[in-house]
Amino acid sequence: MTKDLTSGNPFKIILLFTLPLMLGNLFQQFYSLADTIIVGRFVGVNALAAVGATGSVNYLILGFVIGMCNGFAIPIAQLFGAHDDSDLRRHVANATWLCIAWGVVLTVVTVALTRPIMELMQTPADIIDGASTYIGWIFAGIPFVFLYNMVSAIMRALGDSKTPLYFLVLTSAVNIVLDLVLIINFNMGVLGAAVATDVSQAISGVISLIYLIKKFKILHMTRDEWKYRRSTCRRLSAMGLPMGLQCTITAVGGVIMQWAVNGLGSSVVAAITAAGKTQNLLSCALESIGTAMATYAGQNLGAARLDRVRSGVKSSYIMVVAYSVLAFIALHFGDVVIIGLFLDTKTEVEIVAMARDYMFWNSLFFIPLGALIVWRYTIQGLGYSTLAMMAGVAEMVARTVIALVLIPVLGYFGAELSNPVAWVAACLFLYPAYLWTVKHLENRLLAGHLAMRHSAVGD
């Protein structure tokens, strides 16, 4: 079930590795989309706005969890590329202990602070109860988010991007069925949407864990390999925490933006919710290319093949540009149809118009978005997650400036510019950072090679 990414044509390898990731990300988006569509169509605009008002806070916490799990997997990919199986198993074991500890702490803290957080976000009075209920139950499912994402990250680190897709297809179907039953049949509203998401995530996590234990023989551990090791946890944390914090820092800018947008009223929140869900769906392919590059870069660094890393990044550029152009064209002709999934386009004319404008401005900048994703994940895969985290700071600063300066002056148009400006700001940091990282590692590998030759001559 493992796959070596250190040989073969980079374009073909990355593309084939990306496709299952893309489908998996699409199905993962269906968790959120199913909630949003069914809530918007069967409960109402206020319920849709309530779910949407939690988006940035949701990403703030769950983005940290997912980023940390992906960070824990980077050393695992590097060790797999270096064929150090025993140390690989020790890293998997200690990643498990870290996930358990973080899962307990984050669940307790976030559930306890749900209502104060939504009040701090100046959530409109007519939707704050629904928003607090929804996000509180989502936070209660954090342990299942850890479980599924850590197992999936391990599989990807070992070169298997297909198996997580199969589990997501199943659980997405379960999520949609539960949404329909709990929201429509039992009239549970936003609570039903949150419970459906939690149950679906739990099913995905448990089934994928069972599969990992049974099928990946390379992970069968001795009692000694299961032991907690401080040095191993330090290495895992040195990768995982910056990647988690990168998502969190980026999300802080989103939270500030959400705070500013909430002040524009429920209709604006609903419009951005519908447009934002569509954008997330369309950007899945770009995120998948980036995720593939993290594993690809990690394995090839372990094999001391930085030439393949450069080739892989160039191949990823081609994929990003091709997809971005196609996505822009598809959105140009199908935006009303997509928005119609969330809202009644005949009665909510003003909200539909705002959502269309928002999607237009965002889709114009998909190419820089794709480029920053490729550079960021490549840097992370090469082990420089703190450097990649700094790009999140650039995004946060850009969104903060827009929230505090442009939105008060330009109103909704200022909100439309938030993502494009943040993406460009991150690109201005990440491209030089990528060039420096690869050159720095090439010099280190060359120095190590020369030292070995000198030692051999001396002997």
Question: PLM features: what roles do these ranges have?
Answer:
Residues 48-108, 145-164, 271-335, 369-391:
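Small-residue-rich hydrophobic transmembrane alpha-helices
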Residues 1-18, 76-141, 185-241, 297-364, ...:
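Short alpha-helical transmembrane segments in multi-pass integral membrane proteins
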Residues 5-43, 56-71, 75, 100-107, ...:
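N-terminal transmembrane alpha-helices
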Residues 60-63, 175-180, 205-209, 281-284, ...:
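Hydrophobic transmembrane alpha-helices of multi-pass small-molecule transporters
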Residues 16-35, 137, 148, 171, ...:
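Transmembrane helical elements of multi-pass membrane transporters/channels
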Residues 21, 25, 37, 74, ...:
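Transmembrane alpha-helix boundary and packing residues in multipass membrane permease domains
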Residues 69, 138-156, 164-172, 193-206, ...:
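Short runs within selected transmembrane alpha-helices of multi-pass transporters and secretion channels
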Residues 30-49, 118-125, 181-188, 248-281, ...:
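Helix-terminus/linker motif at the lipid-water interface of multi-pass membrane proteins
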